[in-house]
Amino acid sequence: PHNLGAIIRTAECAGAHGIIIPKRRSVGLTAVVGKASAGALEYMPVARVSNITAAIDTLKKAGVWVYGTAAEGDTTLYRADLKSAAAIVIGNEGEGMSRLVSERCDFKVSIPMKGSISSLNASAAAAIMLYEAVRQRSLADT
């Protein structure tokens, strides 16, 4: 619940349009999530869907590029072009994205790790990805 709340808060602060989470195998929109979001849950639309892969397909048909985060990504987030309409997929901390979700992503993006630990928690990864998109878009606007 704390990771989801932190992701909602960060997404709202970064200007994201919404968040999509699975109905099954994910935390619900509980009071703990709301508290962890520091009130952002009131402003951030959250869709709970029964089929994430179908939701990704719908986004792609609408012209949204889908970027999945993966330790072994095709490119790093610094080389990913996040300036246009983008959906960022953050996988499960323990298992990452499912095979089907990973296959639906247009790009698999890694966050460079320089230390001994090879992964970030989900909310930290989401924050880095979201604010790289903010950075790229602000540079494109100048």
Residue ranges and their predicted role:
Residues 1-142:
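Post-transcriptional modification and biogenesis factors for structured RNAs
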